[in-house]
Amino acid sequence: MKYLLPSAAAGLLLLAAQPTMAANTGGYATTDGGDVSGAVKKTARSLQEIVDIIEAAKKDSSGKVVKGGAFPLVITYNGNEDALIKAAEANICGQWSKDPRGVEIKEFTKGITILGTNGSSANFGIWVVNSSNVVVRNMRFGYMPGGAKDGDAIRIDNSPNVWIDHNEIFAKNFECAGTPDNDTTFESAVDIKKASTNVTVSYNFIHGVKKVGLSGSSNTDTGRNLTYHHNIYSDVNSRLPLQRGGQVHAYNNLYDGIKSSGFNVRQKGIALIESNWFENALNPVTARNDDSNFGTWELRNNNITSPSDFAKYKITWGKPSTPHINADDWKSTGKFPAVSYSYSPVSAQCVKDKLANYAGVGKNQAVLTAANCK
């Protein structure tokens, strides 16, 4: 199914669903980003202007570099790169070899928020490195160049306490012959790696992406706490996420059109997969390509309750030649520990019926509650 997400003007129902405190991310992250007392607020029209604003915020009024940043920062991005996105769409197989374009938030801990205006768009990524207290909201990322050079839409490296909320990330789920492994047409939507932890990924609309996201860059990069909630994934291939160790809590997400595999829980990680909606999915929950250190999962209150539901929701399973475990009996294999935050999941049916009104850009950061499910 192709999802058409309404804009903020599409209905009054969005007005009654504003979030409370920004730090209530519904997940492990507990950050307001730069939206705190003493913040400096700037507007940027381009990638370069965002870069310049961030670099200036690393120095005090005397020009001295301040470790972690001189002040909290809120950047409103109102640029439009639809022309670049359209050109990339017309030349899909020409994108992977280009140089990646991106804003690097590096060694900034004072707090930073990048907020896109409605109608803005970006053909560049945001890469968070050795930073913390970062929020990215209402940004529309399309057809990132530089797939062969790690041109992710969002990359989080060595950075705790990050919130990725109400964005749209899209590409083309397509293999271009001649690229390495025929799979570097585009890189990831959201990669979280290298000791990053306490990250919340919420209310994003991610579609047409082949490799959605990593939790960990290698079998030694393990041990993080991540929450994915109220995201829509449509026409994607795999890595939802590819989890190397640690804890992943995924609730109230909609998965439609998984072409290869969904959750891939490796390196003795554990995932709580709760109150989600799955349909048209191949291997939605699995552990594979990991020798013997398979992870475990707890399945709770999803639309699928037993293998008897697979045909109804078009769930299928493949058996690779390498060692693997599929959730094809739809039974939990582990018990997830108590989470450190409060949250109120709605039913999986409500996710199916209502989430498109809330996920993605142009929604004024509206949230889905039980009151909106009626």
Curated annotation (Swiss-Prot):
Molecular functions (GO terms): metal ion binding; pectate lyase activity
Cofactor(s), names only, from the UniProt record: Ca(2+)
Keyword S-adenosyl-L-methionine listed: no
GO biological process, one term: pectin catabolic process
GO CC, alphabetical: extracellular region
Catalyzed reactions per annotation: Eliminative cleavage of (1->4)-alpha-D-galacturonan to give oligosaccharides with 4-deoxy-alpha-D-galact-4-enuronosyl groups at their non-reducing ends
Pfam family, one: Pectate_lyase_4
Localization: Secreted
Highest taxon of source: Bacteria
Cofactor note: Binds 1 Ca(2+) ion per subunit.
Residues annotated as the enzyme's active site: R239
Family: Belongs to the polysaccharide lyase 1 family. PLADES subfamily.
Function text: Involved in maceration and soft-rotting of plant tissue.
Stated name of the protein: Pectate lyase 1
Lineage: Bacteria, Pseudomonadati, Pseudomonadota, Gammaproteobacteria, Enterobacterales
Name of the coding gene: pel1
